[in-house]
UniProtKB/Swiss-Prot annotation:
PROSITE patterns tied to this protein: RNASE_H_2 (PS51975)
Cofactor(s) needed: Mn(2+); Mg(2+)
Gene from which the chain derives: rnhB
CDD domains the UniProt entry points to: RNase_HII_bacteria_HII_like
Binding-site positions, a divalent metal cation: 23-24, 115
Lineage of the organism: Bacteria, Pseudomonadati, Pseudomonadota, Betaproteobacteria, Burkholderiales
Organism: Janthinobacterium sp. (strain Marseille)
Name assigned to this protein: Ribonuclease HII
């Protein structure tokens, strides 16, 4: 007799629910929007290899994102802009992006399983699952869509602002990113409420040129 996965069996009582998994990408970076995705998987069309997007190679993530969009019953990707992050704070902006993703589904779920320890305010019944992106396949799928969407967005920002090297660090506070920030100043797509960016502003008008 096959032993059940102790993590996945926690959710076996939800078989009759229409479950969407929800996850975010991009809370830590100094630039660009924060993204969230919601996915309702089709049990009749399983997708092999779903797991936490951070544990997958870029090539594998991109391939799985195509499969998810092709085989899921419904999927939705949403974001909150840098301006919204600075206005609301990153936690509230992340919750808002998650709510937008859930509301963007064309199939209405009866239960949203959220990666992490907090749930967004939404009309859908929600449960937070710590490390859910490695426990629940629908959350894994959402993490992959959110991550690939954000990486694509940062690739576009790299075209617009090539001297920041967004294609290499995706906006995260790496040594290279901080060096380019000091060299070129703060761009319109940087999160001005984040300490490393705020420290560089020091009353100086952000750079607007490419």
């Amino acid at each position: 007799m096959k032993k059940e996965d102790p993590n996945l069996s926690l959710f076996s009582f939800l078989d009759e629910d229409i479950i969407c998994g929800v996850d975010e990408a991009g809370r830590g970076p100094l630039a660009g929007p924060v993204f969230a995705a919601a996915v309702i998987l089709d049990p009749m069309r399983p997708i092999d290899g779903l797991r936490d997007s951070k544990k997958l190679t870029e090539v594998k993530r991109d391939a799985l994102a195509i499969e998810i969009k092709q085989y899921a019953l419904s999927w939705s990707i949403a974001q909150c802009s840098e301006e919204e992050i600075d206005s609301l704070n990153i936690l509230q902006a992340t919750m808002l992006a998650m709510r937008r993703a859930i509301e963007g589904l064309h199939v209405v779920p009866t239960l949203a399983l959220i990666d992490g320890n907090r749930c967004p305010v939404t009309s859908v019944r929600s449960e937070a699952i710590i490390k859910g992106d490695d426990k629940v396949q629908a959350i894994s799928a959402a993490s992959i869509l959110a991550k690939t969407a954000r990486d694509h967005a940062l690739g576009l920002l790299h075209i617009q602002y090539p001297h920041y090297a967004f294609d290499q660090h995706k906006g995260y506070p790496t040594a290279l990113h901080l060096e380019r920030l000091r060299e070129h100043g703060v761009s319109p797509v940087h999160r001005k409420s984040y300490a490393p960016v705020r420290a560089l502003l020091g009353g100086v008008t952000p750079a607007n040129k490419v």
